[in-house]
Amino acid sequence: MKISAEALVETEDVKDIYLIENGKETKVGSTTEKIRFVRINGRDAIERVQTLNSDVLGNRKGITIIEKTTFRPISFTDYVNGTQQVKAEYSDEGVHISIKDSEKSIKLNGYYVDTFSVELILRVLPLKSGYSLPLNGFNATLESEVDIHIQVVESELFKRGFDEFVDAWKVKTYFGETLRYYWIDPASKELLKQSSMIGDGLVLEFCRG
């Protein structure tokens, strides 16, 4: 399937981060996402910068750059407390990864996406009841390929702000064995919420205020 980012717009968004332990909710930080259009080596591209600030989860910044017309990955860079931890640079042959003082190249075949671009991909898919899509992914921090499976669960009334409600698609997404849920506003193409089980009775949520 051909995936294009033409429907996306440049945005800046802030979400609160919550840890929910056995039903008890605690705010533990915030995350900022900036999406902008750039030119990389003559190609139209999208740069997504996600910054996480949390005393509990740490301070991270991930920069994902993908081709605008195909969603093919160009690069991913991960920073922890301001220090670069991982740099992945993609080419037709595969991916070259630099982690601290070590480097390696991994051959990748066929069409694949960077796992950190999935939150962009979800916003441009033709989501509807019963929709599903498998993707081949690559996670640079894990240095491994990941099978991704996207499936629409249902349409759910989502409260946005104090008195605004929208019909959002609730989307179940597997990254290998890891399951996350996303809520997508089909009109604005906005990612409203993300939820994942990270331990026994422990849920991590990113939610628009």
Predicted regions and their residues:
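Surface-exposed beta-loop interaction hotspot
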Residues: 92-138
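Acidic, serine/threonine-rich low-complexity disordered tracts
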Residues: 1-92, 133-209
